[in-house]
């Protein structure tokens, strides 16, 4: 199992477009229901900073990379950003649900 976090800040002008593209990814996920992934996305406060957390059962098998909506989202992400994406590996300490 592997968990990664991606955090970045878009321009104010691109924040809504970015959010719409994220919603398209979730629509694809709900339609296709891939196994082996847990995926969450957050907008930090009311600003233009976003955070995504993906937990993959198999680190070498990321179902997101097979989704056209995710590929479209990623394609121009750097162009929408004022703070580029930072990818971090996360190690679990505890969880409660």
Go through the PLM ranges and name each one:
Residues 2-9, 51-53:
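Active-site-flanking beta-strand signature of metal-NTP-handling nucleotidyl enzymes
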Residues 9-20:
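Short, surface-exposed ligand-recognition loops at beta-strand->loop->(often short) alpha-helix junctions
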Residues 11-13, 46, 57-59:
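Short coil/turn motifs at secondary-structure junctions
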Residues 24, 28-38, 54-88:
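An amphipathic, aromatic/His-enriched active-site/gating alpha helix that lines ligand/cofactor pockets
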Residues 36, 45-48:
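Short acidic/glycine-enriched loop/turn segments that link adjacent beta-strands
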Residues 42-44, 95:
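Short beta-strand micro-motifs enriched in acidic
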Residues 45, 90-91:
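Residues at the C-termini of beta-strands that transition into short coil/loop
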Residues 91-97:
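Short, low-order "capping/linker" segments at domain edges
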